Amino acid sequence: MDIRRTVLWMIFSFSLLLLWNNWQIHNGKPSLFGGPAPEAAATQQPKADANGTAASSTASIPSSPAAAPAAASVPGAAAPAAAKSEQVVITTDVLRLTFDSNGAQLIRAELLKYPSSSQSDKPTVLMDRSADLVYVAQTGVVGAPQGESFPTHQTPFHLVSSERSLTGDTLDVVFEAESGGLKVTKTYTLHRGRYDVDVRHAMANTGGAPLNPALYLQLERDGTDPAGTSSFYHTFTGVAVYSEQDKFQKVTFSDIEKKKGTYIKQADNGWIGIVQHYFATAWIPAQGKQRTNELLQVQQNLYAARTIEAVGTIAPGSSANVDAHLWVGPQDQKAMAAVAPGLELVVDYGWLTIIAKPLFTLMTWLHGLLGNWGWTIVALTVIIKAVFFPLAAASYRSMARMKQVAPRLQALKEKYGDDRQKLNQAMMEMYRTEKINPLGGCLPMVVQIPVFIALYWVLLASVEMRGAPWILWVHDLSVRDPFFILPAIMMATMFLQIKLNPTPPDPVQAKVMMIMPLVFGGMMFFFPAGLVLYWCVNNTLSIAQQWTITRNLERQAAAAANR
């Protein structure tokens, strides 16, 4: 009865299953676990016009929300397509944003502090409107009287402000448009060193009758995975909705297309966003005002996440302001938490959040001391191993005792042959005599598994790892080792661990145990270097612990034999 090997075999088999499942998904086939395969449309971009603009549909312009007075839907806005469009490029110390004067919409966002790769000086392009990616932020006003339309994200605006670069602490980018008796002044306020943009919509009634407008804030994105997405480990790309009532909710593009996504529809708090590995965008309306959230498919492989808020009645000659925040940037948990409640939850650790968050806090504290994320991973692994040393010691002592009685166990198997009942009785008697717990080598490992899985997700999800060097050849801990040195070291440490364990009496099982390092090491060839570094350090410390404990037990046994 070797429970530990059974557990290892289960882990090995499940890992192979996950590897095959990811390969199936990568090749567009259904998941083995019942999830949808990637959409066939995911490789197709939304159709674009001659200017590279994604084709519009009437579905991309909302009707008034239920909270607003009854009003007709905005007519299909194909007419503005003929208007001359001006692209306005605004630069801060951390962002380069491109706005289209048609709709005063954000059509490109470059993150100047985040290179696209460790081999490139070009900034990461998070949002764009091109043949490769459609990902934009839009706003507009609906609820116009019958036959009229208010300015939407397809209405021509004109630029009022003149500054294009941030020279002080803030920069205002101002657009204006008037339609249907409503003048809309849209102001984007950018801040030095920040990824949140203040957005104000000032609405003035220039007509002779009261108006009841409603403002929508929306993000549009195609369903393709971000560049560099790995087939060997999964990260979420899709929509996120947060509210105090239902907390953090994720919705895949596939569920939006099938109209089966679960999210809060009516709320007076929270935000909507689009999440991908390391980065996110989000609209955060003013809290305390009722709004309607909508997730929908605009056209093939193009999806919208929007929130619509009734402004209230604006009398002739009067005006109203609606403020919101737009986040465009990395998943920086500290900065996001300062912008809106729950925004930092885009870094989603799932059911292990209760363990992962303290680990991340400890990791950031260690980085403040060490100044290098690679050495931070090493130090964090050492601390975790130290905390679990008593459990590990119990496990290794149990394995060492099992190794000592292995010859006697083999003799019992030869004596009783196929008589399983007598063999098990004899084994249990031997375990009682030698004070060995067959589960002693397994249970301490099981207790540690949630912590190690949580640490895995912390290292995988943390944008701090992106572009972070360690030493010598490791220039980016978020990508695979370019020379595969760390995976080779990991395989070597796994072989050493197997050699330190009792040899399985079953030859087939022994061969399987020797194959495991090759399989896991092969998988690590495609994993981020930071994760492989963690496993290398963890295995090395485990070997040192196991060797020390085994040697001590052997000395104790030798001393007892000499007495």
UniProtKB/Swiss-Prot annotation:
It comes from the Bacteria. Keywords: Cell inner membrane, Cell membrane, Chaperone, Membrane, Protein transport, Transmembrane, Transmembrane helix, Transport. InterPro entries: Membr_insert_YidC (IPR019998), Membr_insert_YidC_N (IPR028053), YidC/ALB3/OXA1/COX18 (IPR001708), YidC/Oxa/ALB_C (IPR028055), YidC_ALB_C (IPR047196), YidC_periplasmic_sf (IPR038221). Gene3D superfamilies: 2.70.98.90. GO terms for biological process: protein insertion into membrane; protein transport. Pfam families: 60KD_IMP, YidC_periplas. CDD domains: 5TM_YidC_Alb3, EcYidC-like_peri. Residues 54-70 have a biased composition (Low complexity). The chain crosses the membrane at residues 6-26, 373-393, 443-463, 482-502, 512-532. GO terms for molecular function: membrane insertase activity. Its main location: membrane. Residues 36-70 are annotated as: Disordered. The keyword Transmembrane helix applies. It is a multi-pass membrane protein. Required for the insertion and/or proper folding and/or complex formation of integral membrane proteins into the membrane. Involved in integration of membrane proteins that insert both dependently and independently of the Sec translocase complex, as well as at least some lipoproteins. Aids folding of multispanning membrane proteins. Belongs to the OXA1/ALB3/YidC family. Type 1 subfamily. Interacts with the Sec translocase complex via SecD. Specifically interacts with transmembrane segments of nascent integral membrane proteins during membrane integration. HAMAP family: YidC_type1. This is Membrane protein insertase YidC. It comes from Bordetella pertussis (strain Tohama I / ATCC BAA-589 / NCTC 13251). The lineage of its organism: Bacteria, Pseudomonadati, Pseudomonadota, Betaproteobacteria, Burkholderiales.
